[in-house]
Curated annotation (Swiss-Prot):
This protein's GO CC annotations: chromosome; cytoplasm; nucleolus; nucleoplasm; spindle
Annotated source species: Mus musculus
Region entry Necessary for nuclear localization and DNA-binding, spans: 1-25
Name listed for the protein in its UniProt record: Peptidyl-prolyl cis-trans isomerase NIMA-interacting 4
Higher taxonomy: Eukaryota, Metazoa, Chordata, Craniata, Vertebrata
Catalytic function, reaction form: [protein]-peptidylproline (omega=180) = [protein]-peptidylproline (omega=0)
Pfam families: Rotamase_3
Record GO terms (molecular function): DNA binding; peptidyl-prolyl cis-trans isomerase activity
Length: 131
């Protein structure tokens, strides 16, 4: 499959946030994840101990959305669903992790382990889609 967006002219009009802004091109080394947007869920905890409790629940087979609802301190408690996020709209470590993860589903989630540390706290991230 050929790489997308090499000159910026092949962008579709659907992705409102991404269209017209070529600022994402400044990181033209292109992380191996590919695509310009990911559908992301996360669990955010300020304290390391709490995020590790959440990690244990995930590893024991509890659904990602349930763990997010129970543990995440993010204001938007929709099972951790952040929706579609474009390159440049996330903080550095979160973005790197999100674009490095494979797409997975609730039945067999692939998530960041260990959690990712940002200025907001600790995140467990999973990716449900890529475009």
């Amino acid at each position: 499959m050929p790489p997308k967006g090499k000159s910026g002219s092949g962008k579709g009009g659907k992705g409102g946030a991404a269209s017209g802004s070529d600022s994402a091109d400044k990181k033209s080394q292109g992380p191996k994840g590919g695509g310009n947007a990911v559908k992301v869920r996360h669990i955010l905890c300020e304290k390391h101990g709490k995020i590790m409790e959440a990690m244990e629940k995930l590893k024991s087979g509890m659904r990602f959305s349930e763990v997010a609802t129970q543990y995440s301190e993010d204001k938007a408690r929709q099972g951790g669903d952040l929706g579609w996020m474009t390159r440049g709209s996330m903080v550095g470590p979160f973005q790197e992790a999100a674009f490095a993860l494979p797409v997975s589903g609730m039945d067999k989630p692939v998530f960041t382990d260990p959690p990712v540390k940002t200025k907001f706290g600790y995140h467990i991230i999973m990716v449900e889609g890529r475009k």
